């Protein structure tokens, strides 16, 4: 898909609409984009590669935008394979090209490419270091655990562009993006980065000092309007604050009786408030969307039957995911159902 950023900053990423599960667990009915960028100046810098599923298409995009030039640098924001799988391929194609990363990047790199010697190809940067490309200049900002330890973002000062790694990313291919950015961005954030709110807050504080006109993430659309709104949502999410004053009812039901109780509760709550109320049968909904809603709302009711001397397994899995993602700062009520040995609560 053609994405216009500027005359000097080119989009060379790809859409993947054949993938069914992102990270082998998140449903992506609209696919995913693997974003990659090219800065063309006196020197040329590639900003990340893409997943190995799309190597050939990415190389075609790169060759087209290079227009006969040779890249001087490959900036590695994030070593996760959906962004770094083609480091070896492009290094072999352009042997004079240098890899730009931080110390953690290069300590981890051999794990992914053990049969390739990068020793004389690396430029190690740290917080605040700059890379001059001509009229464009990149400043590197370390973002450890957003959401891997080697992650860094880059700020291009001439055009005021933040290359934000996985930050501000969304699920969905670029040609299948919904109008509601927040929906897929929220689902992406809480399931991919949600555990690392403190680290996201640290990054937001660093970037607050910058004059940012565009945000170029590694997944999802380039953001170039109303950036304060996007950043504001990230601030809310990473502080673990509710975004919506309302109630999320999450339930499981073996024979339908607990479902009746959940639906009746939903009806009663709706009759007593004008706040938003959402209900989900966890056995039949997307877990990632349920995690998203749990974090979105200010209140949650979990309703489940007893099973094998404990809570129903699907509810147990849901609660486990909330725990590891750092769920807090909400009011929660629990309802258990059990005829002869109630044990869910």
Feature locations, PLM:
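Helix-loop-strand module that forms the ligand-binding subsite of alpha/beta enzymes
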Residues: 284-345
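Active-site neighborhood of phospho(di)ester-bond hydrolases with catalytic His/Asp-centered motifs
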Residues: 47-49, 71-79, 99-102, 162-166, ...
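Metallo-beta-lactamase
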Residues: 4-7, 101-225
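Short glycine-rich, flexible loops that bind phosphorylated cofactors or substrates
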Residues: 19, 224, 308-310
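Conserved beta-strand hairpin/beta-sheet module of binuclear metal-dependent hydrolase folds
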Residues: 2-62, 153-156, 160-164, 258
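Active-site metal-binding motif and surrounding structural segment of the metallo-beta-lactamase
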Residues: 53-100
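Short helix-loop-beta junction
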Residues: 263-278
């Amino acid at each position: 898909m053609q994405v216009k950023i500027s005359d000097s900053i080119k989009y060379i990423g790809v859409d993947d609409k054949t993938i069914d599960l992102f990270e082998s667990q998140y449903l992506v009915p609209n696919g995913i984009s693997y974003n990659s960028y090219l800065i063309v100046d006196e020197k040329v810098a590639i900003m990340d590669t893409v997943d190995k599923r799309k190597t050939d298409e990415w190389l075609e995009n790169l060759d087209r935008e290079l227009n006969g030039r040779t890249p001087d640098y490959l900036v590695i924001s994030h070593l996760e394979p959906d962004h770094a799988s083609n480091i070896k391929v492009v290094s072999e194609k352009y042997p004079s090209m240098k890899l730009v990363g931080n110390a953690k990047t290069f300590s981890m790199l051999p794990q992914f490419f053990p049969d390739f010697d990068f020793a004389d190809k690396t430029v190690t940067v740290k917080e605040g270091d700059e890379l001059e490309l001509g009229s464009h200049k990149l400043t590197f900002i370390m973002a450890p655990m957003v959401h891997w330890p080697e992650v860094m973002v880059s700020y291009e000062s001439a055009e005021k562009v933040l290359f934000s790694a996985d930050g501000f990313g969304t699920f969905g291919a670029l040609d299948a993006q919904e109008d509601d950015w927040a929906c897929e961005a929220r689902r992406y954030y809480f399931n991919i980065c949600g555990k690392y709110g403190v680290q996201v807050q640290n990054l937001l504080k660093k970037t607050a000092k910058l004059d940012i006109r565009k945000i170029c993430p590694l997944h999802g659309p380039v953001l170039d309007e109303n950036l304060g709104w996007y950043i504001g949502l990230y601030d809310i999410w990473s502080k673990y604050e509710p975004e919506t004053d309302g109630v999320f009812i999450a339930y499981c039901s073996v024979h339908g009786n607990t479902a009746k109780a959940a639906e009746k509760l939903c009806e009663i709550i709706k009759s007593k408030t004008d706040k938003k109320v959402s209900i989900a049968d966890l056995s039949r909904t997307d877990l990632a969307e349920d995690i998203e809603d749990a974090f979105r709302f200010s209140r949650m009711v979990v309703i489940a039957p007893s099973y094998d001397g404990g809570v129903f397994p699907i509810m147990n899995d849901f609660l486990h995911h909330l725990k590891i993602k750092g769920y807090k700062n909400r009011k929660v009520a629990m309802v258990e159902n059990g005829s002869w040995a109630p044990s869910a609560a």
